[in-house]
Amino acid sequence: MLIRFGYVSHAMALWDCSPAKTMTFTSFKKLSKQEREDKLYHVIRQNLEHTIRILHYNIAHEIPLYRLSSSIVPLATHPEVEFDYIGVFTPLWRKIGALIKEHNLRISFHPNQFTLFTSDKPHITTNAITDMTYHYKILDAIGIADSSYINIHVGGAYGNKEKAIERFHENIKKLPTHIKKQMTLENDDKTYTTAETLSICQKENIPFVFDYHHHMANLCEEPLEELLPAIFETWSHTNISPKVHISSPRSEKEFRAHAEYIDLEFIKPFLHIAKKHNHNFDIMIESKQKDLALFQLIDELSAIRGIKRISGAMLQW
């Protein structure tokens, strides 16, 4: 069984390398037209150049998974801001794409919790489509839209989970097919359990990104041993390994909050269940210390008898 690892957005080991530098709409409004464009394009260029630095770092450390920052282009989906963030930066998008393709990196996006399809308010669905389209356009500009995924949560329950799930199935029809084809769903830590999310994924033929920490915070009746094969099966039509999110609680009191690093004892039960099924899969680490947490976890896991480190961020068990 091969397990590959990756992390989210910022490489903590790199100095001044945020790929998510921002520009607020408030500061944008205060500037003249030319100043707005100059400032905004400067921030975007920084984010893209920092992303390139991070990709070089990942390649050097043989880290095959990476989640791009959704904030890579500030104000991209703001209704009062219109600008060309694709054509102007074509050389940089292509440079990012060339690195990803040459080194066979697995890239993803994870829009925020407001991008959802369960609401009864039409503007929420419209905004979700706008946000999903923004993420897809970036993947397309990079040249990896047909092999990369945009991951979201199911959404809210709004007092009636059954009705909300029905709305999800209706609202998702409004998302263009080519974008839906590149989306995944994740179980959350309060509302939609692993079993509920799996059912939705199966009905819509959407790959399921299983989050173990969320599962432990929002348990369902069905045991994970029974659910995991079906979860992994949702990826079968993609020819890509299933992906799992890993983090651990900050404390018993703050169980849902993410700790700085991964507590190996917390994730061991999941790893043993996965080993029983012996299916290759990828792990996205969602700890606060990101790449540093990744290295620490791999060091700890590779010290276990029977687990062999075969590259910077890949284990064989």
UniProtKB/Swiss-Prot annotation:
Listed InterPro entries: UvdE (IPR004601), UvdE_bac (IPR023520), Xyl_isomerase-like_sf (IPR036237)
Protein's gene: uvsE
Record-linked HAMAP family: UV_endonuclease
Pfam families the UniProt entry points to: UvdE
Coiled coil: none
First-level EC class: hydrolase
Entry's Gene Ontology BP terms: nucleotide-excision repair; pyrimidine dimer repair; response to UV
UniProt-listed Enzyme Commission number(s): 3.-.-.-
Keyword flag Hydrolase: yes
Record's protein name: UV DNA damage endonuclease
Gene Ontology MF annotations: endonuclease activity
Similarity section: Belongs to the uve1/UvsE family.
Keyword line: DNA damage, DNA excision, DNA repair, Endonuclease, Hydrolase, Nuclease
Protein function: Component in a DNA repair pathway. Removal of UV LIGHT damaged nucleotides. Recognizes pyrimidine dimers and cleave a phosphodiester bond immediately 5' to the lesion.
